Amino acid sequence: MIEKLEYWFSKCSDCLLHPEYTKLLDELYNYELNQEIIDFLCDKATSKKHWCEIRFEHLKILLLNETSFNYDLKQFYFDSLKRCRRLWLKMFYIRGYAFYATEDELLPVMKKFQQQLEKNHDYIDYEYILSEAGLPYLAEKYNYTYLKETLETAKKEYQKIDPLLRGYFTMNEKLEHINLISNEEALKRSKEFLEKHKI
């Protein structure tokens, strides 16, 4: 499997996965992962050469394939979330870290994340963060008070975003992107937003 992964990944671009490579990634969701594949996925999930969306396709397997939790990835997730600048992607590194971390270890990570939520109002970040796979998942699974507080902060800050930029998409429990409005409606809202703000 690793040879196939490496070969077809070499056929991918920085922003687009080759169809054959995508098929291999799909197989990995139900594949018993070994150390070699874990290392491969970790490397690709943090590659600065590729777009966030490409990194996320590899991270999703680590988060959803339960055999990945047979390996100690605590330091990988911690290092990754510290380096990650994109808030929505950081959210999912935190999700991985939470599996290994104690309540006390996760607290400072979430406090800093909460502060970042109060500074950042990129609507794309919030759609991912507030999806059922994001903060709501963490708050329900671990039931820590500070996770619930962070979720409330995210909801409050989301309301500060222009309504024309909210509600375009979400993510389900399988970390799949779900469009909430049609392309026509998205284009209409975008035009209204540009006119409203004279951009």
Segments (PLM) and residue ranges:
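Amphipathic alpha-helical scaffolding segments comprising HEAT/armadillo-like alpha-solenoid repeats
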Residues: 1-10, 32-44, 67-80, 103-115, ...
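Extended, charge-rich alpha-helical scaffold/interaction domains
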Residues: 2, 12-16, 179
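Helix-centric, low-specificity signal for extended rod-like, repetitive segments
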Residues: 4, 48, 67, 75, ...
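Eukaryotic acidic, Ser/Thr-rich intrinsically disordered low-complexity regions
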Residues: 147, 151-199
